[in-house]
Amino acid sequence: MIHLILGGARSGKSGYAERQLADLCPANVRPWYLATAEAADEEMARRIAHHQTARQGGSLEWQLAEVPLDLAKALVQRSGSGAPVLVDCLTLWLSNQLCFGADMASERAALLQAVAEFDGDLLLVSNEVGSGIVPLGELSRRFVDEAGWLNQALAAKADRVTLVVAGLPLALKPVSSDSSGSLGLSASGTSPDPRGKV
């Protein structure tokens, strides 16, 4: 089962993901926490420490792997292990890739393939960054574009997609008993109504 969990900064998405994973985790199994953050400055070090402290108070004994760049390989290595995997977060992984000048098309393709082929329960945390203003800088605009494309591609592959706002989870997928999940759109993403109304 692939579950994509989206939300803004400090929306509660990480805590929600950890609780969801705790519900999935079989007894006597140590789930994997794949952390993509690097403590490049004091503020990021505090954020990392906050997440670590929050996890220590929970009921799970985590296996931690720090994976700032080679996330696809880390997923392949853990596929079929029987231990659920939580990736937190894809936004920082993307930021790391862009800062290191990676070929995003190939990195995104490798990650999407690893996710599609993953055997087990996989929870992916990512920021929803496309709801704000268009950034002024070229790198910032590219980041927002890449994050949007990545989130869309992952949402298409995911069994479940949840948006967390103010600590409240909103189920985006599945949305109803309609197996297409199309919200009235055709397979091409266009409205079936010739006037463009859904």
Put a short name on every predicted segment.
Residues 2-77:
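Conserved P-loop
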Residues 17, 51, 86, 127, ...:
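Residue-level signal for inorganic ion chemistry
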Residues 29-32, 83, 121, 160:
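Residues at the starts of beta-strands that form the adenosine-phosphate
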Residues 33-35, 87, 124, 163:
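Structural beta-sheet core signal
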Residues 49, 53-54, 58-79, 84-99, ...:
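Portal/gating segments that form or line small-molecule/metal binding sites
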Residues 183-185:
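Leucine-biased recognition of intrinsically disordered, low-complexity hydrophobic segments
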Residues 191-192:
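N-terminal polybasic/positive-inside topogenic patches
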